[in-house]
Design a protein with these regions (language model features):
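Residues at or immediately flanking beta-strands
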Residues: 364, 393, 448, 620-622, ...
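Hydrophobic, Leu/Ile/Phe/Ala-enriched alpha-helical segments that form helix-helix packing faces
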Residues: 440, 471, 524-528, 603-611, ...
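A general secondary-structure junction signal
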Residues: 22, 65-67, 115, 367-369, ...
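Intrinsically disordered or highly flexible coil/loop and linker segments, enriched in small
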Residues: 105-109, 362, 446-449, 530, ...
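Long, largely alpha-helical accessory region at the distal end of helicase-like NTP-driven motors
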Residues: 567-652
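Accessory, non-ATPase domains that flank or precede helicase/AAA+ motor cores in DNA-metabolism machines
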Residues: 1-299, 306, 311-327, 618-620, ...
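Inter-lobe coupling/hinge segments of SF2-like helicase ATPases
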Residues: 158-241, 245-593, 641-642, 650
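A general secondary-structure signal for short beta-strands and their flanking turns/coil
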Residues: 13-17, 29, 464, 534, ...
Length: 681
């Protein structure tokens, strides 16, 4: 262990020193030694935050070790201790070491990603609203069977990994709650993960109606630093049985962890795109293995990774094939061609919207693009309005009358003529939710219409909750939105779901494109008819022969997953192999190009030397991609990458780690590594 008992050390009449970790990038020294003055010797403990002077600035550091061994160099003194008790447990410290090794990340960055409140000087407790009254629930036979199976394993202390595959509206939450009750009755604690922060609002209402709200904590990035610190301290002190949150909640410092629930496990939001590119599912598996805890993953659209796992009996599959509400029926699904359509809302969808409003029901319209119009193009010469800082087209936002880049967020005045040939007419090739809202309001001026996308929710605190609550309370007739409306929300009065342009955002260069499209359309379709006998889903698309869309229409999820799985296996794609990616960014394209070439050559030489030494024991490794990224430039930085594949992830982690350790960094080039990347864009 990297720490010692400070009380034992203080019994000796010797100076005390602390090794502290300061957040630094991979390959840069992170551990430094500071003297502990006598007035702090009784306070300092492993896992506490300390304030130190580092390179002339007051910096927050994490105490990683305490000793009496006097260093051979002059040391500065710790300025003060920020915590009364440790905020990192031995388990989390060991977990951070594993994450650092697996994902080839800086150990200090991993630790500091756990305590993102590192600069908070005081703590506040998250305040729950008054609980709603618990509804009387009548279980379906399938729910009852699933609950009995899980509870039997828990009673017999036979740790299992479960996959709850249930159609949308089948009552997966009730199965989760029953498992949680059993765990808490055994004095165990629970982590409940959801993919989006917005989904915590509805879930918290249900949780506080069922469980003691004083024993529930919330962890997600929308909390202030002081709120997050307050919740973290409650958890680590043993005051909490249930932690609910988005992906970072998987690191909650619960003692006696007994169960991790991962709802909507297919969702790509569980993969971090920050400094430490972890997947919450991988971390959940590791924590359950360490703590001998149960895991329940659930979705209506299993990821190919989990589909492969329960096909190979590595996960115990539980099925919910029917909706929980007795009167609810499967929605009728129509696919409507929108090829070269002159209007955003097709005549078929327009008629369905009118019928829905006449029947006093509600509708959800989904489009996976925000903004008003996309891809401003000159019909005369083909010029496209591109972001000068990124290799992507600009998006027109009518409410601000500006062209905006959705990557670097640069804004430019709207233009009325081509900047290449000066033609006075320009056209847009696609559109966003803002235009859909305008057209719907023009078609149905009497309807109450709301929009839910990042442009709207970024305007203030609790905007998401307010809009979704108004829709739930039937104060809104039509809700227009991006992926925010597709995930996990439960609206009882929705009888129509319209998908405006199903292929929007579909990227052929993404090997997961078909899977993501299927998941998205199936999930958004599931928002309708959850408590109604009759409901419709109308999918507008440029490609009516799309395999994912036909699978949704024909209710052939098994066939679709089998086909995608077989294709991935044939082409040696995840989950049948692991991918590892090194991505470089530089303002000088030549530097990025030269650096990726050096990295590729070093890795190939290293791998060849390993083969020459012990060929029979070294797994196969291949280069999947090399050169410019699909999006060649972002934020004025040119992007190059190298993608490796192997069935053994440890080999990939080792090759990248050794490369970063031994190659001299190139000034002006930033390196990012990613194990099991979600995409290769």
């Amino acid at each position: 262990m990297p720490w010692q008992n400070s009380s034992i050390l203080r019994e000796c009449d010797m100076a005390t020193y602390a090794n502290v970790l300061i957040k630094t990038p991979l390959g840069v020294k992170a551990e430094y030694t500071y003297k502990v003055d006598s007035d702090l010797e009784d306070k300092i403990k492993f896992g506490e935050r300390a304030e130190v002077l580092f390179r002339g600035k007051k910096t927050v550091a994490l105490v990683a070790g305490i000793s009496h061994e006097e260093p051979s160099f002059e040391t500065k003194s710790i300025l003060r201790i920020l915590d009364d008790n440790p905020i990192i447990t031995p388990e989390l410290y060991s977990l951070a070491e594993w994450v650092s090794s697996y994902y080839v990340s800086s150990f200090s960055e991993v630790l500091y990603s756990l305590i993102s409140f590192k600069n908070a000087k005081f703590s506040r407790v998250y305040e729950f609203k008054d609980s709603v009254q618990q509804e009387n629930i009548t279980l379906t036979q399938e729910q009852d069977n699933a609950i009995r199976r899980i509870r039997t394993s828990m009673d017999e202390h036979k740790t299992e990994s479960y996959y709850l595959w249930g159609v949308t509206g089948s009552g997966k939450t009730e199965v989760y709650f029953a498992a949680m009750e059993k765990m808490i009755s055994q004095n165990k604690s629970v982590i409940y993960l959801v993919p989006e922060i917005g989904l915590t609002h509805q879930l918290i209402e249900k949780l506080t109606a069922r469980f003691d709200k004083t024993r529930i904590a919330v962890l997600h990035s929308a909390l202030t630093d002081s709120q997050r610190l307050g919740e973290w301290k409650r958890i680590i002190s043993g005051e909490v049985d249930i932690v609910i949150g988005a992906r970072s909640a998987v690191f909650a410092p619960l003692s006696n962890l007994g169960l991790i629930i991962m709802d909507e496990e297919h969702d790509s939001s569980y993969k971090s795109d920050s400094f430490v590119r972890y997947h919450a599912r991988t971390i959940a598996y590791k924590r359950c293995q360490t703590n001998n805890a149960f895991i329940i993953l659930g979705s209506a659209t299993p990821s190919i990774e989990c589909y492969k796992a329960f096909k190979e009996n590595k996960l115990c599959l539980l099925r919910l094939t029917k909706r929980a509400c007795p009167m609810a029926r499967e929605s009728e699904i129509e696919i409507v061609s929108a090829f070269r359509s002159a209007t955003v809302i097709s005549p078929r969808l327009m008629d369905a919207l009118k019928e829905t409003l006449d029947e006093k029901k509600q509708a959800i319209l989904f489009l996976n693009k925000r903004g008003f119009l996309h891809r401003l193009e000159c019909p005369e010469c083909g010029w496209i309005a591109m972001c000068p800082h990124c290799a992507v087209p600009l998006t027109y936002h009518k409410n601000t009358n500006k062209l905006i880049c959705h990557h670097c967020h640069s804004e430019y005045p709207a233009i009325t003529h081509c900047k290449n040939c000066y033609a006075e007419t320009t056209t847009f090739r696609s559109y966003g939710t803002e235009l859909v809202e305008e057209e719907v309001k023009a078609l149905f001026p009497y309807a109450r219409v709301s929009r839910l996308d990042r442009d709207v929710t970024s305007k203030g605190k609790n905007v998401f909750e307010t809009i979704s609550r108004d829709f739930y309370d039937k104060k809104t007739d039509i809700l227009i939105g991006t992926q925010m409306v597709a995930k996990g929300l439960n609206f009882p009065n929705v009888s129509l779901v319209g998908v405006i342009n199903a292929m929007s955002g579909y990227t052929m260069s993404d090997f997961r494109a078909d899977e993501k499209l299927f998941d998205l359309i199936e999930q958004v379709a599931g928002r309708g008819g959850r408590f109604l006998e009759k409901s419709k889903v109308i999918v507008q698309t440029d490609d009516i022969s799309s395999a994912p869309l036909l699978a949704v229409k024909n209710r052939d999820i098994n066939g679709f997953l089998d086909n995608v799985s077989a294709m991935r296996q044939t082409l040696s794609l995840p989950p049948f192999v692991h991918f590892a990616r090194i991505a470089l960014r530089s303002k000088k394209e030549e530097k990025a190009s030269d650096a990726i070439s050096k990295i590729k050559n070093y890795i190939m030489d290293l791998y060849q030397n390993m083969l020459n030494t012990n060929k029979d024991k070294i797994p196969q490794m291949n280069i999947v991609a090399y050169g410019k990224c699909s999006i060649e430039k972002l934020n004025d930085e040119y992007r190059y990458h190298l993608v490796l594949s192997s069935k053994k992830v440890k080999l990939l982690s080792f090759l990248i780690s050794e490369t970063i350790k031994n190659l001299t960094p190139i000034y002006g080039v930033r390196l990012e590594s990613d194990i099991d990347p979600d995409d290769l864009l």
